[in-house]
Amino acid sequence: MTDIHWSDDARVVVARAKMEPLRARPYSLGELFSSDINVKNQRTLFAYVPGSGEQAAGRKDRGFATVVGIVDHEPGKVLVDFIAWPESIGDETLTSSVYKVDAGSGNRQEIEQTKQTASFSFDGRGRARLRTTTDGNDNPVLMYRPGAGEQWL
């Protein structure tokens, strides 16, 4: 496990990780899980969990998830950046989505989405205020949102 985040006083969110020779520390595999401090009530937040036989699939998240923030005024909620994997050969569109996730229940609400790979910066209320993407020449493009729900400038 790596990337440990406290979502509230009694619950942590962790990323499944892998350790390889000659690497200084484990690296995230893009799957997120939560647990209370007693290691009970564990939840899969983001991962690809296929079904088998009669069992339905638990989660079918085809992509890479990272915790990018904690929502200060809503204990137990984290902000997760999810970059979807391409759907087919030649598909270079990597959709970026940001979710507000309840670490206890696993419920999620999409709060941002862009059809290109992007990173976001958030204010104290968990609202995306800065968005960084790249143009056709791989130059960074920084966009600003003056207030909640307003257009990107």
Which functions belong to the PLM regions below?
Residues 1-153:
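Beta-propeller folds
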